[in-house]
């Protein structure tokens, strides 16, 4: 079996979708002939058990289309799997594939959750829905949800009822249990730094509880837009808790698991 996965970015700063593609390829690539198609970025991750192809972005429409069609012709996949929504490249690769009668699976990765749709609703989401995104959802052969809650929200949208739930996997072989449960007074947030993650809620909550958290260290780990990170840092200063919170940037591999083991509490506030 041959499968093409299209994903707009496999850069490490893209967070969960990049990690998903890495973990998926580790196992799926053992079972099928797997090809991943994406675009050039500054810090692409290494993905094993597959062939990675880079094509031009939407800004080079003709070149992008030509190279995508070339790959379809060369690989002749049984399934084309589109990852993510709202970016024109996702809808275009789907459209070009379906014009040649390829079967499409669309994985929104939470990008059709209510909070995401409401964000920039009139300026971005409505134009995208009218131009391409609604049609892409309707015409996909299957939508892939990762949880029942996501499926329920996709059904509420009402564009496509062919939805299958497949949870995201995690590689557990290299994860070891904590050797000590001694309290270290460390709280951890670890994810992509993005407004949808609700980090401001965490910061505001810490400000309310700062008298009870005097000896605690709150680590906020992850990469994201520098302007937004600076906004969050400024918020900690305004609330008088800058000395409680440490922004430590992106962490990966063993360093990530080390932070989890050292933390007494992991917090992931989110809008979706």
Predicted segments with their positions:
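Acidic anion/phosphate-binding donor-loop and adjacent secondary structure
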Residues: 155, 165-184
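Membrane-proximal helix-turn-helix segments that form the acceptor-binding/catalytic region
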Residues: 99, 112, 125-143, 157
């Amino acid at each position: 079996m041959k499968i093409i996965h299209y994903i707009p970015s496999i850069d490490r700063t893209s967070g969960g979708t990049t990690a998903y593609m890495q973990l998926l390829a580790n196992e799926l690539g053992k079972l099928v002939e797997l090809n991943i198609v994406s675009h050039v970025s500054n810090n692409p991750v290494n993905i094993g058990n597959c062939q990675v192809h880079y094509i031009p972005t939407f800004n080079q429409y003709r070149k992008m289309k030509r190279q995508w069609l070339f790959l379809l012709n060369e690989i002749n996949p049984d399934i084309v799997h589109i990852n993510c929504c709202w970016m024109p490249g996702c809808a275009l690769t789907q459209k070009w594939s379906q014009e040649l009668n390829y079967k499409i699976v669309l994985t929104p990765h939470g990008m059709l959750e209510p909070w995401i749709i409401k964000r920039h609703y009139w300026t971005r989401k409505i134009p995208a829905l009218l131009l391409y995104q609604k049609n892409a959802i309707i015409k996909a052969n299957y939508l892939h949800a990762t949880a029942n809650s996501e499926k329920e929200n996709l059904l509420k949208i009402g564009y496509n009822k062919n939805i299958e739930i497949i949870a995201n996997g995690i590689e557990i072989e290299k994860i070891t249990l904590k050797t000590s449960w001694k309290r270290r007074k460390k709280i951890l947030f670890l994810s992509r730094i993005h407004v949808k993650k609700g980090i401001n809620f965490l910061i505001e909550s810490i400000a309310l509880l700062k008298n009870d958290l005097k000896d605690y260290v709150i680590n906020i780990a992850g990469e994201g837009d520098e302007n937004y990170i600076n906004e969050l840092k400024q918020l900690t200063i305004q609330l008088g808790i800058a000395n409680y919170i440490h922004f430590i940037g992106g962490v990966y591999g063993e360093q990530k698991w080390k932070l989890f083991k050292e933390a007494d509490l992991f917090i992931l506030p989110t809008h979706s």
